From Swiss-Prot:
GO annotations of cellular component type: cytoplasm
Gene3D superfamilies: Isopropylmalate Dehydrogenase (3.40.718.10)
Job of this protein: Catalyzes the reversible formation of acyl-phosphate (acyl-PO(4)) from acyl-[acyl-carrier-protein] (acyl-ACP). This enzyme utilizes acyl-ACP as fatty acyl donor, but not acyl-CoA.
Annotated localization: Cytoplasm
The organism's taxonomic lineage, starting at the top: Bacteria, Pseudomonadati, Acidobacteriota, Terriglobia, Bryobacterales
Lineage: superkingdom: Bacteria
Name this protein carries in UniProt: Phosphate acyltransferase
EC number(s) per entry: 2.3.1.274
Family: Belongs to the PlsX family.
Catalytic reaction annotation: a fatty acyl-[ACP] + phosphate = an acyl phosphate + holo-[ACP]
Record text on subunit structure and interactions: Homodimer. Probably interacts with PlsY.
Recorded GO MF terms: phosphate:acyl-[acyl carrier protein] acyltransferase activity
Amino acid sequence: MLTIALDAMGGDHAPKAEVEGAVRAAGSLGVKVILVGQQDVVRRELEQHEGHRDLPIEIVHASERVTMEDSAAKAVRSKRDSSMRVASRLVRDGCAQGFVSAGNTGAVMATAKMVQGVVPGVDRPALLGVFPTMQGNPVVLVDVGANVDCSPEMLAQFAVMGDIYSRNILHRRNPRVGLLSIGEEEHKGNDLTRAAWPLLKSLRINFIGNVEGRDMYAGNVDVIVCDGFIGNVALKVSEGLVDMFKKLLRESLEATISGKIGYALSKSALTNFRKRLDHSEYGGAPLLGVRGGCIIGHGSSNANSIKNAIRVAAEFSGGKVNQQIEEELLRLGKAGD
């Protein structure tokens, strides 16, 4: 049974959402969850869930908590007994196979890189985002915020890591990998994308060339590569569009009697539609290139988000993603020597 260490004090709704998500995961996913946080607080929350004693859940005490206002440096250097750091340490020490936190993103990344270490061959770990498409198959975007400034070589590594993730976790047989730019032609883009293009072309991946922002939801590409600045903007725009679309749809349906009747008749279909757009269904963003695996949840994660983040962490570990990343980057390094 895989064991996942969960930062029970991270996120806007901690520890309630974290504990409920852990209970759901332990009860349905066949994984053990270690809740890391202030023991009395976490235990009190856990006692609210009937049957929790029969589930593979353990509590590990951590006296400190990293807040959303803490800098990454403060989280790493000053709060040595934070729930975030203790959870990461459990992975480093082999007590858990994955680390999940919905806390301060910068602090989680800094903690995971320092405590767990980086996979050999990886220059910079990258955050991967998963998005729905019109074709039904999800697309992944790498990087969505870990590295705002990137080199062409880093984008090439992101392409390799995204390809491996898509194959092993999303089960795409031959993922189509595209480089995000402002035009499909090879010469389009900025200095970074033009320099990265031939590097991606030389890789053992199904590189389809440049793709544009509109391709992100079309379903004609499986992995999109970009620097973390552009990726994070795309992520936040997507979240805003989903919120706006849900609001406008609800207002339109509630505006007239016929709309209300239509809503009642199509409630099941609309529920499934909302589910496809709900970021909580995707759990969290894997930090690719960190030893042991690290999944970073949205700060507003609810119990469903936490459960799915634990699921992603278990799939990541079970799919041996890091092992394949290390092997492929080692091969590329030798080929370049």
